[in-house]
Amino acid sequence: MPARQSFTDLKNLVLCDIGNTHIHFAQNYQLFSSAKEDLKRLGIQKEIFYISVNEENEKALLNCYPNAKNIAGFFHLETDYIGLGIDRQMACLAVNNGVVVDAGSAITIDLVKEGKHLGGCILPGLAQYIHAYKKSAKILEQPFKTLDSLEILPKNTRDAVNYGMILSVISCIQHLAKNQKIYLCGGDAKYLSAFLPHSVCKERLVFDGMEIALKKAGILECK
Amino acid sequence: MPARQSFTDLKNLVLCDIGNTHIHFAQNYQLFSSAKEDLKRLGIQKEIFYISVNEENEKALLNCYPNAKNIAGFFHLETDYIGLGIDRQMACLAVNNGVVVDAGSAITIDLVKEGKHLGGCILPGLAQYIHAYKKSAKILEQPFKTLDSLEILPKNTRDAVNYGMILSVISCIQHLAKNQKIYLCGGDAKYLSAFLPHSVCKERLVFDGMEIALKKAGILECK
């Protein structure tokens, strides 16, 4: 590996997680997101270290910030899973024992035991369920309704659709988690977390993993 | 109510359940289905009693068999649910205590206690999940794969998608059922039943409900 610049503090660099819809950044402890069209406007001066699951958005980042560095090769997550997304790998790297849920445009559920990734499964993103309901029957294309609780059984179509979607996602996570701690990240983390007693929202989970990876690679100094 | 012909035996009439995709029939103890284009070819001679959730398919039936009778008005299911599909009502009418799952182009899950419908929820049909996955990310549009068990955690994208879909449906049903008996009908009933220990497949469930309704209305003689 070539000699690389080393940073004494997270403050001196910018972390970037390139997703399928948005591009997420962590600058020190500030989090912000951008569409690929707005990247230039961000005017980032510091060195960018990134991961990406979307080639097109990655190109857009490199177009604006040609020195940004992909850190996918700088770390290793122990797993037998073939094709595990780099964002899922980073989130799992930040958890030693527990269940990692990334609830974004898809919902990924991964199990980690003593730092080893044991496997995981994928559900559609909450906003994407509408397409499956619409194809099931026209009347099932219902507007999203936030639920306060799953205690009361639905008594109309709109509630029945929203309840089914949330209960199936929640009970799937709980079935896999059993009594383990649940770590949630992604846009729907906060909403889902309210239904999961043993869970914590960790907005920075992917960035926490990136920080660990940079430390292991010696790019960021361990304090 | 006008005087109606009374039948001594189920053998003397044909039951019909008009769905969104197919039109299902029960002739004595034989079950068969038809697309609306093929109805004429069936050449049914006996009197038809039907329920319908699809206006277009209903018109097609009446076009071929103008004497067919809609029995929706002939019965009552105790419920506070507004807009409960007539097929769900009929399936629930056939169960006194338990959970009724109709796994077709949508998956409906309904709870019945001492003959009263307590409420229920709706999930997309298994075949319809593909549309939600596709919208979540292109790579998640995976072909359906039948799973033998949910014991082994997925270690690739195709398994992760199929496992997530099945586990979320199964764990949702189990969460609602607790220790109650689960009655499954619809095209995917047999497949789902294999993952649900306290379940029975009842292919005729909707027709059993229709038979009860006809008996209560005095159209079919009680033996």
Curated annotation (Swiss-Prot), chains A, B:
A monovalent cation. Ammonium or potassium. It holds the Pfam family Pan_kinase. ATP binds at D17, I18, G19, N20, T21, H22, I23, H24, S105. The active site is at D87 (proton acceptor). K(+) binds at D102. Keywords: ATP-binding, Coenzyme A biosynthesis, Cytoplasm, Kinase, Metal-binding, Nucleotide-binding, Potassium, Transferase. One of its GO terms (molecular function) is metal ion binding. It catalyses: (R)-pantothenate + ATP = (R)-4'-phosphopantothenate + ADP + H(+). CDD domains: ASKHA_NBD_PanK-III (cd24015). Its cofactor is NH4(+); K(+). InterPro entries: ATPase_NBD, Type_III_PanK. GO terms for cellular component: cytoplasm. It comes from the Bacteria. Pathway: Cofactor biosynthesis; coenzyme A biosynthesis; CoA from (R)-pantothenate: step 1/5. Substrate binds at Y81, G85, I86, D87, R88, T157. GO terms for biological process: coenzyme A biosynthetic process. Its EC number is 2.7.1.33. Homodimer. Belongs to the type III pantothenate kinase family. PANTHER family: TYPE III PANTOTHENATE KINASE (PTHR34265:SF1). Catalyzes the phosphorylation of pantothenate (Pan), the first step in CoA biosynthesis. This is Type III pantothenate kinase.
